[in-house]
């Protein structure tokens, strides 16, 4: 896990131009940053380098401009958010490469921080064009990647440049990689995984990878219905991908071969309409009526799943157990998340969670701060769970 270098290895950076890849792809409302979480994540790295006298040059993308300049996707729009979080003025350089970028960098002094323009304004970014990576490398002396959320992309600012300059992991990247290694790379066993969400089709590769790595696989959300159907359960009007029953059976077989126990709900909360607080029934999975939908895991199954977690030492969580955005179908997700949080607080469980819906669910349960690590990385977290190589990480190991 120490195959990559961190800021501990970077040496004297006084007066050095350090290109730092960060995640500034933040949500905006009425022209202002509405959630600065991603900016805040990069602050320890930015401050550390600035305090050590580096010239800190921030590289990032914003939106999907598809290789063309678009003023509605300029990083100038997020400057207010960056300055608010950092607590002082930051220079904006309206180019990322070329003479304009070089001129902007030339006026900076040690300790200064600047944001370069959206890297995706250049076709060479997403194409990982060697010429674009060369042009980026011309304006820096060192490279730091602090954007795990973009590490699954082989782009010029994540992969190409890391092979042209001395490359290091920033503090946020370092924390993420250590947490992920503790969860699946070299975990304390037994290991449990919670995988939820609406569709099996979006998580097939995750499930196939996990059955070979974890001891207990807890499947929830709409995707559990497909697995129940594969076991011969009539799930009524529930969301169910009947065309993937064979895939579900293949995953059952792979789990059996690997010694992984798959846990499905055996009691469920059903309703005839998917709406807030409708009339509901809690029934055995074999008692779902033809006009009912499964919308959450039932109380007996929640208790059994809590017992599974109590006997595990490591947990990876991706996706809610029920339709958590719509009460009362948040009950199972909240209850199991609070169990995991309590076990983490008492020191018996290492808990790592990730994915947009997962973060929202843990925040809803009020326990995101109690998990060992919560990743906001989305696609990169999912590809890591699938066991796929992450080009931005691999480039740091070169």
Curated annotation (Swiss-Prot):
Its chief place of residence is cytoplasm
Residues that coordinate or bind ATP: 203, 325, 355-358
Q: Where in the cell is it found?
A: Cytoplasm
Pathway listed for it? Carbohydrate degradation; glycolysis; pyruvate from D-glyceraldehyde 3-phosphate: step 2/5
A Pfam family hit? PGK
Q: Which PROSITE patterns match?
A: PGLYCERATE_KINASE
Ordered alphabetically, the record's keywords are: ATP-binding, Cytoplasm, Glycolysis, Kinase, Nucleotide-binding, Transferase
What GO molecular functions are on record for this protein? ADP binding; ATP binding; phosphoglycerate kinase activity
**BP term (GO), one:** gluconeogenesis
Q: Record-annotated residues binding substrate?
A: 23-25, 38, 61-64, 120, 153
**Entry keyword annotation includes ATP-binding:** yes
Which Gene3D superfamilies does the protein's record reference?
A: Phosphoglycerate kinase, N-terminal domain
Gene Ontology cellular component terms for the protein in this record: cytosol
- Which InterPro entries does the record associate with it? Phosphoglycerate_kinase, Phosphoglycerate_kinase_CS, Phosphoglycerate_kinase_N, Phosphoglycerate_kinase_sf
The record's catalysed reaction(s) read: (2R)-3-phosphoglycerate + ATP = (2R)-3-phospho-glyceroyl phosphate + ADP
Domain of life (superkingdom):
Bacteria
E.C. number(s) listed in UniProt: 2.7.2.3
EC top class, as a word: transferase
Family per similarity comment: Belongs to the phosphoglycerate kinase family.
Summarize subunit and interaction data from the UniProt record for this chain. Monomer.
What protein name applies here? Phosphoglycerate kinase
What gene, per UniProt, encodes this protein? Answer: pgk
């Amino acid at each position: 896990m120490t195959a990559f270098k961190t800021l501990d290895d970077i040496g004297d950076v006084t007066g050095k131009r350090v290109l730092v890849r960060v995640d500034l792809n933040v949500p905006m409302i009425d022209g202002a940053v509405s959630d600065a979480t991603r900016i805040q994540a990069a602050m320890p790295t930015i401050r550390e380098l600035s305090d050590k006298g580096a010239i800190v040059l921030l590289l990032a993308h914003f939106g999907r401009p598809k290789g063309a300049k678009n003023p509605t996707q300029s990083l100038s729009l997020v400057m207010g958010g960056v300055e608010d979080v950092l607590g002082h003025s930051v220079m904006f350089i309206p180019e990322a490469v070329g003479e304009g970028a070089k001129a902007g960098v030339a006026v900076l002094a040690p300790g200064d921080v600047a944001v370069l323009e959206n890297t995706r304004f250049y076709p060479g970014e997403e194409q990982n064009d060697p010429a674009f990576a060369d042009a980026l490398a011309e304006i820096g002396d060192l490279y730091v990647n602090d954007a795990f959320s973009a590490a699954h992309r082989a782009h010029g600012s994540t992969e190409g440049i890391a092979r042209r300059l001395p490359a290091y992991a920033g503090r946020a990247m370092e924390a993420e990689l250590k947490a992920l290694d503790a969860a699946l790379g070299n975990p304390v066993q037994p290991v449990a995984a919670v995988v939820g969400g609406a569709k099996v089709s979006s998580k097939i590769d995750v499930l196939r990878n996990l059955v070979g790595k974890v001891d207990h696989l807890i499947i929830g959300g709409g995707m559990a219905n497909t697995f129940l159907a594969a076991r011969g359960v009539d799930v009524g009007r529930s969301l169910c991908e009947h065309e993937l029953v064979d895939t579900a059976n293949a995953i059952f077989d792979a789990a059996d071969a690997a010694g992984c126990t798959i846990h499905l709900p055996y009691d469920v909360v059903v309703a005839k309409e998917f709406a807030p607080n409708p009339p509901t029934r809690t029934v055995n999975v074999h008692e779902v009526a033809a006009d009912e939908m499964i919308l959450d895991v039932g109380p007996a199954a929640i208790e059994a799943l809590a017992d599974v977690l109590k006997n595990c030492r490591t947990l990876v969580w991706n996706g809610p157990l029920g339709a958590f955005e719509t009460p009362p179908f948040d009950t199972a997700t909240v209850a199991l998340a609070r169990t995991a949080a309590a076990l983490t607080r008492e020191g018996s469980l290492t808990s790592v969670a990730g994915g947009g819906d997962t973060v929202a669910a843990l925040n809803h349960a009020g326990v995101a701060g109690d998990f060992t690590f919560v990743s906001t990385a989305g696609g990169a977290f999912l590809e890591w769970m699938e066991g796929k190589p992450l080009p931005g990480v691999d480039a740091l190991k070169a």
